[in-house]
């Protein structure tokens, strides 16, 4: 059973917080939005219960692992990379690639079109044991295809065409696109990105499931947590906490002028979750002059860089803390320097205890300063809890789209830059 709770009390009880009447007034719109999600579910709502994607991903992952792969390079950008990176960073050992007994290949993410990073990946992989997974629905994403062509060239040079082709996976649209044509031409292993699922909503498709399974993560539990979120939405409707959160964040923006939403995660392992959510919220809602600006932060690190602004800067933010109650591992603080009052008091505590105390201290300080804040609590950092949370945040984003009156599934604002890039790089049919 997933253990994820949403605490919105400090959006209601602080000075300038929301009122019960405001939530009552918006409730008909919430019910309508949830009704649409459940009656005509978008693609991401169906993923947790789609066995075929899970089974296909597990089958390919087993091929990779049984082949004795030393390296697995995941090539993608945006949601095609951020989602898989969340799963790996949150659920794997923090230094997974350095472990001598990982039980699986090293994972590398070729995301940005950065020559230094790409060259670095080529420096450390062992071509004879490397598998590549290239992820793009269209096969025309410039950054992804450029990275793929470079890695393909290096592997083909080292292994020959047959060797490269035998260790390349294509995750793309099942029917169309340039990458689909390449896969058919070279008889590459293929996984499907459902046509109705956009990249930023694709983490529970083969986009996220394959690299997670390659790393030995419990993808069954991940999907079970997400499915539980959908079940609770069906049971609770507009009272589901993810839906209530959509209303609160929308109202904080529309009626209070708090148009910056900070997700502050109190676990290094969740740093990529904040980055993933920034894309999800920004790209889904930032349209027609609407939408609030998401920002990621990590506690306690950013207490020493950003908290000053949150405490005493402009009243334009809502801080959302993500807290993990039980850490996968904890470390006791040994006794030393007992005569120094500024040091000795730490003895006998644990580092996890310090992290949780500072999390609560930040929440109390923000509330005391009249700064609205919310908390998402995970009982532990498990695959089931993470699946629930990511599904809930996707639901929240979709409902917020209805409240803002925008389509949360398109991204017209990024097309102009793509067209200019295509023209300047010489793609036929495009002019600068």
From Swiss-Prot:
EC number(s) per entry: 5.3.1.9
Pfam families: PGI
Family the UniProt entry places it in: Belongs to the GPI family.
Pathway(s): Carbohydrate biosynthesis; gluconeogenesis; Carbohydrate degradation; glycolysis; D-glyceraldehyde 3-phosphate and glycerone phosphate from D-glucose: step 2/4
Known role: Catalyzes the reversible isomerization of glucose-6-phosphate to fructose-6-phosphate.
Stored PANTHER family: GLUCOSE-6-PHOSPHATE ISOMERASE
Gene: pgi
GO molecular function: carbohydrate derivative binding; glucose-6-phosphate isomerase activity; monosaccharide binding
Coiled coil: none
CDD domains: SIS_PGI_1, SIS_PGI_2
SUPFAM superfamilies, A to Z: SIS domain
Claim: Isomerase is one of the keywords in the record: yes
Annotated InterPro entries: G6P_Isomerase, Phosphoglucose_isomerase_CS, SIS_dom_sf, SIS_PGI_1, SIS_PGI_2
Active site: 283, 304, 418
Keywords in alphabetical order: Cytoplasm, Gluconeogenesis, Glycolysis, Isomerase
GO BP field: gluconeogenesis; glucose 6-phosphate metabolic process; glycolytic process
PROSITE patterns: P_GLUCOSE_ISOMERASE_2 (PS00174), P_GLUCOSE_ISOMERASE_3 (PS51463)
Assigned GO CC terms: cytosol
Record localization: Cytoplasm
Name this polypeptide is given: Glucose-6-phosphate isomerase
């Amino acid at each position: 059973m997933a253990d994820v709770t949403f605490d919105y009390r400090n959006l209601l009880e602080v000075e300038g917080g929301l009122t019960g009447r405001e939530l009552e007034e918006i409730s008909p719109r919430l019910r309508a939005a949830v009704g649409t999600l459940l009656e005509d579910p978008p693609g991401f709502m169906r993923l947790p219960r789609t066995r075929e994607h899970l089974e296909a991903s597990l089958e390919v992952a087993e091929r990779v692992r049984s082949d004795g792969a030393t390296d697995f390079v995941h090539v993608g950008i945006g949601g095609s990379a951020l989602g898989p990176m969340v799963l790996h960073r949150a659920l794997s050992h923090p230094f997974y690639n350095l472990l001598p007994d990982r039980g699986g290949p090293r994972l590398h993410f070729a995301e940005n079109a950065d020559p230094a990073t790409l060259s670095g990946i080529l420096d450390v992989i062992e071509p004879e044991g490397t598998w590549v997974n290239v992820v793009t629905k269209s096969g025309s994403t410039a950054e992804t295809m450029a990275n793929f062509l470079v890695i393909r060239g290096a592997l083909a040079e080292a292994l020959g065409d047959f060797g490269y082709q035998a260790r390349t996976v294509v995750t793309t649209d099942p029917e169309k696109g340039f990458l689909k044509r390449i896969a058919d031409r070279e008889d590459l292993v293929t996984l499907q990105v459902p046509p109705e699922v956009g990249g930023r909503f694709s983490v529970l498709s083969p986009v996220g499931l394959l690299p997670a399974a390659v790393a030995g993560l419990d993808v069954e539990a991940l999907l079970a947590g997400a499915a539980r979120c959908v079940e609770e939405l069906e049971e609770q409707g507009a009272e589901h906490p993810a839906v209530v959160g959509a209303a609160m964040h929308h109202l904080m923006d529309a009626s209070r002028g708090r148009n910056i939403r900070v997700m502050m995660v109190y676990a290094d392992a969740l740093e990529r979750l904040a980055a993933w959510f920034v894309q999800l919220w920004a790209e889904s809602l930032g349209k027609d002059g609407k939408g609030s600006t998401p920002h990621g932060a990590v506690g306690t690190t950013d207490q020493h860089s950003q908290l000053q602004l949150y405490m005493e800067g402009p009243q334009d933010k809502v801080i959302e803390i993500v807290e993990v109650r039980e850490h996968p591992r904890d470390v006791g603080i040994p006794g030393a320097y007992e005569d120094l009052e500024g040091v000795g008091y730490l003895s006998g505590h644990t580092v996890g205890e310090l992290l949780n105390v500072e999390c609560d201290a930040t929440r109390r300080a923000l509330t005391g300063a009249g700064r609205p804040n919310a908390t998402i609590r995970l009982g532990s950092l498990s695959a089931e809890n993470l699946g629930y949370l990511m599904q809930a945040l996707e639901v929240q984003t979709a409902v917020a789209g209805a409240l803002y009156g925008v389509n949360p599934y398109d991204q017209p604002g990024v097309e102009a830059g793509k067209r200019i890039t295509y023209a300047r790089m010489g793609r036929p049919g495009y002019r600068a």
